[in-house]
């Protein structure tokens, strides 16, 4: 299958070619997002489209895992934010999440995802599209309005702690000689896993971890 069929990141120019010429046109990519969702349990595919502060457009999808309860699923918003982190984005500006099976209604994220978004730097400024199929345009509402009387990282973390999508280094290392442990730019899978772990966000448990995988075609993935 064509690689573009599994495309989750669009430059501003690529997004424009898909009809995303201004914020209200983010839904033009929701069909692509929903087609990539994996919902074998509920059959309810959710897509999310977000614009990062850099101007690039990202897709997110829900992922359900057969044999496990639904609370182990990855929500589309969480998928999208992880996508931002893996691409070294500094923040999320706009977000559109479908709440209907036909992809024509857009609403606020679930309570779990609203709290998850609070882990991002300047989260309260994130604008979320609210639109029903009966509205021509809809409107953007800030997370500040959608999550009143909120709990935030500032309530528990030390002042100045790096938040999600902010630069961080967990100061982890692997045992071995200098020749065996290189850098995140080398071809060693363990070095890529170490780099992922050093960028891991786990401020409440202090248990950072990372993983790197390589497929049969030589492509590698990290998280």
Curated annotation (Swiss-Prot):
CDD domains: cytidine_deaminase (cd01283). The keyword Hydrolase applies. One of its GO terms (molecular function) is cytidine deaminase activity. It holds the Pfam family dCMP_cyt_deam_2. Keywords: Hydrolase, Metal-binding, Zinc. GO terms for biological process: cytidine deamination. It is an enzyme of class 3 (hydrolase). It catalyses: cytidine + H2O + H(+) = uridine + NH4(+); 2'-deoxycytidine + H2O + H(+) = 2'-deoxyuridine + NH4(+). GO terms for cellular component: cytoplasm. Residues 21-154, 184-223 form the CMP/dCMP-type deaminase domain. Its EC number is 3.5.4.5. Binds 1 zinc ion per subunit. The active site is at residue 77. Its cofactor is Zn(2+). The keyword Hydrolase applies. Substrate binds at residues 62-64. Homodimer. Belongs to the cytidine and deoxycytidylate deaminase family. This enzyme scavenges exogenous and endogenous cytidine and 2'-deoxycytidine for UMP synthesis. PANTHER family: CYTIDINE DEAMINASE. This is Cytidine deaminase 3.
């Amino acid at each position: 299958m064509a690689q573009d069929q599994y495309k989750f990141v669009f430059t501003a120019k690529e997004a424009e070619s898909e009809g995303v010429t201004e914020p209200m046109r983010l839904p033009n990519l929701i069909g692509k997002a929903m087609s990539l969702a994996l919902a074998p349990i509920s059959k309810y595919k959710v897509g999310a489209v977000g614009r990062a502060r850099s101007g690039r457009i990202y897709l997110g999808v829900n992922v359900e895992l057969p044999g496990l309860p639904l609370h182990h699923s990855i929500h589309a918003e969480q998928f999208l934010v992880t996508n931002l982190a893996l691409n070294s984005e500094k923040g999320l500006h706009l977000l559109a999440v479908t709440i209907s099976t036909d992809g024509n209604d857009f609403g606020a994220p679930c309570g779990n995802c609203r709290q998850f978004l609070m882990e991002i730097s300047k989260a309260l400024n994130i604008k979320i599209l609210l639109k029903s199929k009966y509205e021509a345009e809809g409107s953007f509402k800030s997370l500040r309005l959608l999550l009143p009387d909120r709990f935030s990282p500032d309530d528990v973390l030390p002042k100045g702690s790096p938040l999600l999508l902010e630069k961080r280094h967990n100061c982890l290392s692997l045992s071995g000689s200098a020749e065996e442990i290189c850098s995140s730019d080398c071809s060693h899978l363990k070095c890529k896993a170490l780099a992922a772990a050093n960028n891991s966000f786990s401020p409440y448990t202090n248990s950072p971890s990372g993983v790197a995988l390589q497929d049969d075609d030589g492509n590698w993935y990290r998280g």
